[in-house]
Structure formats: C-alpha cells, structure tokens
Curated annotation (Swiss-Prot):
GO biological process: symbiont-mediated evasion of host restriction-modification system; symbiont-mediated suppression of host innate immune response
Coiled coil: none
Keywords noted in UniProt: Host-virus interaction, Inhibition of host innate immune response by virus, Restriction-modification system evasion by virus, Viral immunoevasion
Known function: Ral interferes with the cleavage of DNA by E.coli EcoK restriction-modification system, by modifying the activity of the host methylase. This modulation allows incoming, unmodified phages to escape the host's restriction system.
Record-linked InterPro entries: Antirestriction_protein_Ral (IPR022759)
Protein name: Restriction inhibitor protein ral
UniProt keyword annotation of rRNA-binding present: no
Family to which the UniProt record says this protein belongs: Belongs to the lambda phage ral family.
Keyword 4Fe-4S: no
Length: 76
C-alpha cells in the first residue's frame, strides 16, 4: 500500500498564522515531501522540523510570559 501525503492540502486546512512570522520556515522542502525510511522506521522530516519550530516559538512565548509575570510581581 502506498500513501501519498500532499503537504499543501494538509497545511491548507489550517488558517495561516502570520503572527509568528514563521510561514516561510513552515514551507515543505523538496527532500521533505515524503517520509523516508531510517533505521527501519518511517521518518517525516517535515513534521519533525515544524514540530521543533513550533516548540521553539512556544518556548519563547513562555519565557516572555514568565518575564512579564515577574515584572508585574514587583509592581504590586
């Protein structure tokens, strides 16, 4: 059985968020169009890359939120 994943169709179901400025980073590179076999397992490099990108941005948001919370504690 062959499965084809159209990343353009997949991404198209989500609203594009331009707030994080990562839209160009989320684009699928030609070498990432299909999962590849590595060490006997299928690996989706696009999914790994975009998950890391999202985690990085969420970490930045959490750091900023923590910084703002620490500032508001001193204001009280």
């Amino acid at each position: 059985m062959t499965t084809t994943i159209d990343k353009n169709q997949w991404c198209g179901q989500f609203k594009r968020c331009n707030g994080c400025k990562l839209q160009s980073e989320c684009m699928v590179k030609p070498e990432e169009m299909f999962p590849v076999m590595e060490d006997g397992k299928y690996v989706d490099k696009w999914a790994i890359r975009t998950t890391a990108m999202i985690a990085r941005e969420l970490g930045k948001q959490l750091d900023e939120d923590a910084r703002l919370c620490s500032l508001s504690v001193f204001d009280a």
